Amino acid sequence: MDKKTKKHRSLYIPYAGPVLLEFPLLNKGSAFSAEERSSFNLLGLLPEVVETIEEQAERAWIQYQGFKTEIDKHIYLRNIQDTNETLFYRLVQNHLEEMMPVIYTPTVGAACERFSEIYRRSRGVFISYENRHNMDDILQNVPNHNIKVIVVTDGERILGLGDQGIGGMGIPIGKLSLYTACGGISPAYTLPVVLDVGTNNQQLLTDPLYMGWRHPRVTDDEYYQFVDDFIQAVKHRWPDVLLQFEDFAQKNAMPLLNRYRDEICSFNDDIQGTAAVTAGTLIAASRAAGSQLSYQKIVFLGAGSAGCGIAEQIIAQTQREGLSEELARSRVFMVDRFGLLTDAMPNLLPFQTKLVQKRENLKNWDTDNEVLSLLDVVRNVKPDILIGVSGQTGLFTEEIIREMHKHCERPIVMPLSNPTSRVEATPQDIIVWTEGNALVATGSPFDPVIWKDKVYPIAQCNNSYIFPGIGLGVIASGASRITDEMLMSASETLAQHSPLVKNGEGLVLPELKDIHIVSRAIAFAVGKMAQQQGVAVKTSADALQQAIDENFWMPEYRSYRRTSI
């Protein structure tokens, strides 16, 4: 069946009347045709006029503009999503640049903090530790049989906001909204999940409105057994699903990824997605400057799982460009709250050990400090690139940025911490402190900076450039695993779509209006690499492209015909 026929054929629906209107995936509201209203017992349940989806979207846009705060806009959009998903995605598609920061970062942070307060209607699956023995039954309660993408969190490290308990559910919901809005994955194929293992947030534990399990967090063997029970139940119900780990605490994120990435098709977006989009941004920025990433010296502030994941991706890329592993690692410097990571530092985490600098190689540094601060590192390394993943605001001080600029004419500065309140430095300050010479990319959206009558666009190094395309590529190719090479192919493809690289001007990352083009291209690259790696069945390029096209969902109403259950 060709793509056009498949996407325009009628759907046979067993629901009718108010039940149909309460089904978000199927509800059309005022767009039900006269024939459908008669067939599905909807006569008199809707206003007389039959509207198009564009007319509905225009009304929703007018209503949206009436809300003054970002959190109220978020609540409004979530209400549409929970009543008419097709309309929700048409509205978001029409206003993606305006609405992406509202449905996801930074506004989703406030929505997570206030989750129990603003709760309206259930979405997704809440699995509490108290119900751990009912795991299979819980997943059987999900009405969608063909789930292809799950985003799961335990709510312990939500953005830079810490432990939000079940309030962390806002992240999987928002993330999956972007899988659909940016990557064309049908909402019928997606499932947000929160693992409710308690919370150590005392404010939540004493909040009478808090809807989660009121208990300190389960840890150690009990925690890992609970997660394993969930993974096994998922494999039993949906063996081919793509599982994305989201906002797990540092102590659990990497162990869970390493444990399950070869058991189920899975990845951690905080570690691997952030690494892929950052690497793609840096590849593009280096090429735009007529250079290569392998020529750059890079300093990180933040040596957690996300920062180390980015560093490892960069090291892999520079090895592809010709560096030895030893030389590649010698050009990357990791700084955390205890200073520069060195081989003399005790109590390093396993994923940090390969990213240390040899203390012996630092003996000629211009400093008497035993603990080497970020300023010490910048002064002695003279980096070309400074990346912030600390989750702490204001740590890129004027002194540090000006010191960097002394030795680098066009510094690349990337304060990536989310949400906006946690950013290491604002783009405005960085532009001023570098006399307009810095290339700035941030984790959260920022308006362009105007300095000395010149406009400086600020690229958002947003994972949504990467993970929707990866998801689409996995679904289209039928990949059983996500390999490092698949992630690197996504980074390379993103860099190839940089306006700054292609045109010599503009943003280092594509505009959001081109996100579907980018996601399709990444999906093809990821699917092709999956085939080369032997984790997907080999097909022709044309067949892979056809599979991508067939799986790319657009927010358009289908005609309905009634059938019995």
Swiss-Prot record:
Cofactor(s) demanded: Mg(2+); Mn(2+)
Gene Ontology CC, one term: cytosol
Example GO biological process: malate metabolic process
GO MF annotations in UniProt: malate dehydrogenase (decarboxylating) (NAD+) activity; metal ion binding; NAD binding; oxaloacetate decarboxylase activity
Site feature: Important for activity: 270
Domain of life, per lineage: Bacteria
EC number in record: 1.1.1.38
Sites where the protein binds NAD(+): 157, 270, 418
Residues where a divalent metal cation binds: 246-247, 270
Cofactor, free-text remark: Divalent metal cations. Prefers magnesium or manganese.
Active site, per annotation: 104, 175
Reaction(s) this enzyme catalyzes, per UniProt: (S)-malate + NAD(+) = pyruvate + CO2 + NADH; oxaloacetate + H(+) = pyruvate + CO2
Keyword Manganese: no
Subunit: Homotetramer.
Family according to the record: Belongs to the malic enzymes family.
Protein name in the entry: NAD-dependent malic enzyme
Organism, as annotated: Enterobacter sp. (strain 638)
Gene name, Swiss-Prot/TrEMBL: maeA
